[in-house]
Amino acid sequence: LANRLPPVAALYDLWRTRSTGLLSGGRLVLAGELALLREWLLPTGGPFLDVGTGTGVYREALGEGMVGVDPSPAFLEVAQRRRPGAYLLAHGERLPFREGAFSGVGIGPPWTEFLDPEGAAREARRVLRPGGRLFGLLLLGPGASLGLFRPTPEALLRLLEGAGFRAEVRRLGRLGLVLAEVG
């Protein structure tokens, strides 16, 4: 709920530039996250979808071929101002796109905040074309914490496979890096 407030959206980039390094125990910084995102998704050719785009950080890696969706009008306003491009108000569990519309989907840290993480994984799979790829980064558990989805790597792998992905989950400190392909 707090993430929908304008002050949180305005200050989010300050947290985002530091959080990857802090939560990964220094194993990955934001620049490294964006490099991995590019390396994993760009070879698919685009277009790309960023689910839970927030302030549009992934646009720095994916460029104009990216569409960002977020349920927060405040975040989308900041995204459009800081990283102009195509953004839509939408939830990751109910994406407003046709089946197979994208070659790559990125889901960053907001994955932990989905009310239905399994539904979000199924939706990501639905909008990916055959051979499409998913990139994800999220806080690992074990278990939910303060209402956040925080799976173990094994539970996350089962969730992704259940949604139709062949996936790899790498633990980086408290973060899980997801590299998945349509199965």
What residue ranges belong to the model's regions?
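Conserved class I S-adenosyl-L-methionine
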Residues: 1-43, 57-58, 75, 142-144
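Class I SAM-dependent methyltransferase SAM/SAH-binding core
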Residues: 49-94
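A short acidic, Gly/Pro-enriched loop at the edge of an enzyme's catalytic core
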Residues: 93-105
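A short SAM/SAH-binding and catalytic strip from SAM-dependent methyltransferases
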Residues: 104-116
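A short glycine-rich, Lys/Arg-flanked "PGG" loop and its adjoining helix->strand segment in the class I
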Residues: 118-130
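Conserved beta-strand signature within the Rossmann-like core of class I S-adenosyl-L-methionine
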Residues: 132-139
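Short alpha-helix
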Residues: 148-163
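Core SAM-dependent methyltransferase catalytic element
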Residues: 163-165, 169-183
